[in-house]
Regions:
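Bacterial N-terminal signal peptides that target proteins for export
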Residues: 6-25
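Bacterial N-terminal signal peptides
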Residues: 24-32
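OB-fold and OB-like single-stranded nucleic-acid-recognition modules
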Residues: 34-231
Length: 231
């Protein structure tokens, strides 16, 4: 566990955003961890190919231990609310480098699974991030192969919190668009104090929402890209 993370307590149908980040209150200088030029360590596995057709798996969290993230001007305590595993294709990736949100959640990944990974659908699907932590989904064509509702329930924008410096480096340098990935960890809520002001984070717990607050906030403990596993 990195030095700034400590456990607290015992162990063309239209364009819409799929979600918005959890209402930034302050903007502060950013601290990014991970050594310059240092490669992420991984283990090569003989696991079967990544199946991106199934829905994400979400179970009650086996622990509610708080995870404290120390920031330049305060802290945020994360509370796991669900164990989460998602196998998907990376549609878009964005790194953030300013504000307390970037200190806590430096990466956003827009992920798709199910029919959205099929070539006939993927070629008609446009997904991109903007600088407000939204992921925009657009389906092209007068008769798209899937409904907009299907696209909204088989794609998600994920605010990633790497649990280790190695995972930070892996997400930063090794994850790219069109990669097939498996991400495991915990969906978390958060509350903290920054420059005397209370800040809060709340994760989505369903894949059916598509508005503000619909992002998954994911504390990442394991990442697989192809046959490589990072922790």
């Amino acid at each position: 566990m990195p030095a700034n993370r400590t456990l607290i307590g015992p162990p063309a149908m239209g364009i819409r955003w799929i979600c918005r980040g959890a209402g930034w209150i302050l903007l502060l200088a950013v601290v990014l961890f991970g050594g310059c030029g240092e490669k992420a360590a991984s283990v090569t596995t003989a696991l079967p190919p990544i199946d991106v057709k199934a829905d994400p798996v979400q179970d009650p969290s086996p622990t509610q231990e708080k995870i404290r993230i120390k920031l330049k001007a305060g802290f945020v305590d994360l509370v796991p609310v669900a164990h989460y595993r998602i196998a998907a294709v990376v549609a878009s990736k964005r790194k953030y480098t300013s504000g307390w949100g970037a200190e806590v959640m430096p990466f956003d990944l827009a992920l798709v699974w199910g029919r959205l990974t099929d070539p006939d659908v993927a070629e008609n699907l446009q997904i991109k991030h903007d600088n407000t932590r939204l992921a925009w989904f657009r389906i092209k064509g007068e008769e798209p192969p899937v409904s907009f509702e299907y696209a909204m329930s088989h794609g998600s924008n994920n605010h990633l919190i790497p649990a280790t410096p190695n995972l930070f480096r892996a997400i930063d340098r090794d994850v790219g668009a069109k990669d097939r990935v498996v991400i495991e960890g915990y969906l978390v809520n958060g509350e903290g104090l920054i420059e005397g002001q209370t800040v809060r984070l709340k994760t989505s717990l369903t894949r059916e929402d598509s508005d503000r607050g619909a992002c998954e906030i994911l504390y990442v403990t394991s990442l697989r890209i192809g046959d490589r596993v990072y922790r």
